[in-house]
Amino acid sequence: MRIGILTHHYVKNYGAFLQMKGMYETLQRLYPEAEVRVINYVNQKHWRRNIIHILHFRPGVDTLSTYVEKIRQLRTFTKYERSIPRTRSVKTAKEIIDLKLDLIVLGSDEIWNLCGSGYHPLKFGTGLENQRTIAYAPSVGAVTEETAVPEDVFSGLKHLDRISGRDVESLKFVERACGRKAEKMLDPTFLYNFDMDIERENIKPKPYRYILIYDLSLIHISEPTRRS
């Protein structure tokens, strides 16, 4: 059995990598005899905006040493990213079909975010209607009930063999877009235990108690909040 995962595997942030890793490892556990691969489809516009954002030198914030450290971190991140097996590079639905996959999994991450630069009908299954395709816990991100739904996502959503989302807004979107009821499913980052990876990389626990806040935007935290 050959399984392909269509997701934002090329996006350089921790959440994107962890959901891909969680999905890959979970599918390998469920189907140990299967060949599981990430479908190497890259939306070039999305990739460029992401990488430019990372490599941008911020005057007054970055210094030469912090910028060098940023590049080092990017190289380390890319090493882990590429540890997940992927297919040959594909650019169209036909090229994905030519991979002759037995199952295509769409998700998770914000692959259904109509408002972002990563939008493409392919991520909704459009062009893959005759393939065995399911959507596992994708998200619409910033999409709301007021967001217009492009007609070219309808066919893909309508023909998915199974359909789910990871949040309420995604379930609402599916019903509004194609009239189907989607199931709410757990994000794949919660399906896989990363402890073995942490141990293998010899990552030591911090010698103090802390709360980790992961956010893609810079949020001002007041001093009283910081102290508490």
PLM-predicted stretches and their roles:
Residues 3-14, 18-155:
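Aromatic- and Gly/Pro-rich donor/ligand-binding loops
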Residues 219-228:
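Single conserved hydrophobic/aromatic residue that forms the stacking wall/gate
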Residues 87-101, 112, 137-209, 215-216:
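A nucleotide-sugar donor-handling region in carbohydrate enzymes
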